Amino acid sequence: MFICKICDEEYDENMRYSRDSRYCKKCGEERTQYLSYRRDTLASLRSMPLEAKIIQTKFLINQAVRTFGEDHCYISYSGGKDSTVLSHITKQLYPNILHLFANTTNEYPETLKHIQWEIKENHTNIIIVYPIDSKGEMWNFKKVVEHYGYPMFSKRVSNAIRTYQHAKTPHTKQNSIDYIERNFKKYQKYMESPISDKCCDKLKKEPLRRKAKELGMECVILGILASESYQREKAWLEYGCNVFYKFKDNQCKPLSFWTDDDINEYIEKYNVKIPDLYNMDYTRNGCMFCGFGVHLEAPESNRYQKLKETHPKQYAYFIDNFGGMMLQFDIIV
């Protein structure tokens, strides 16, 4: 017998939803129809012209601020294109809204330079948050890798491998093996490699949450696009842009339905200043050494080889400390 994840009713093999055994047939079919409708809705939102998207984005931001108050909302600011567009729009409504920037110790120099410009020249209300844990211990990228493993391939793959490696019971371990076999067969050979998804938690998410709690913040405004990853699109299909009082963190994601083209159009149209990194043919400003998605890049011209050209000092540090790991992961550096 099984227990449906939605209705909590027991069901046997004959009443199991064929596409996903977590649901009974009735709930599984209804969920599939709902997600299909949500995908159509997302496609419709994405097809709107830029000015309509700006109006909708401002509505969502206002909804968050009206719900929690301006003094209890903050922008999680990375210094990248998406969060800079979000900041530009939000400051039109609330010029002094708080921004929290997590210095992960793995930032591009151009990102840090842009943060200082935002603070000193653009008068953006930014607090820089460092990766200090609840015990007062300072972390950095190398320390996280040594303790937990390297962020490689994708968050889902890294999480699956970490779960397998740290399973506390034979049952959990077998479930992890089955999950990887079912979803990530091509990564099975890396199951014993030092891989983990904990990096973002230790260097960014947890320090930001602690600082937000310390400051009495109740809602985070995030400049993320649903198109950026499977997980983000799945989250939008399930919950939409503004997710209040459902989870531990209240979230406003008013750019979810934007595309990369929308972001670029907005930057050009409104002359928004972004880090010089984007003038060096980079399309993202995330952590320098992050391995998420590197396997999808051209083997002979991936982000690490680009780092060698644009930031030789940082590349030398990367090779000295993590070059051996890249060989284990079959990544050309």
Residue ranges and their predicted role:
Residues 21-24, 28-39:
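Basic DNA-binding region of bZIP-type proteins
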Residues 38-42, 214, 247-248, 260-333:
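ATP/NTP-dependent adenylation/nucleotidyl-transfer catalytic domains that generate, transfer
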Residues 5-6, 26-29, 289:
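Short, cysteine/histidine-rich loop/knuckle motifs that typically chelate Zn2+
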Residues 13-22, 279-282:
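Short linker/helix segments within small regulatory modules
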Residues 2-17:
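Short recognition patches in nucleic-acid-associated and regulatory proteins
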Residues 1, 21, 284-287:
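Residues immediately within or flanking Cys/His clusters that coordinate Zn2+
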Residues 8-11, 28-31, 106, 294:
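Cys/His-rich microdomains that often coordinate metals
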Residues 34-265, 269:
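ATP-dependent adenylation/nucleotidyltransferase module used to activate substrates
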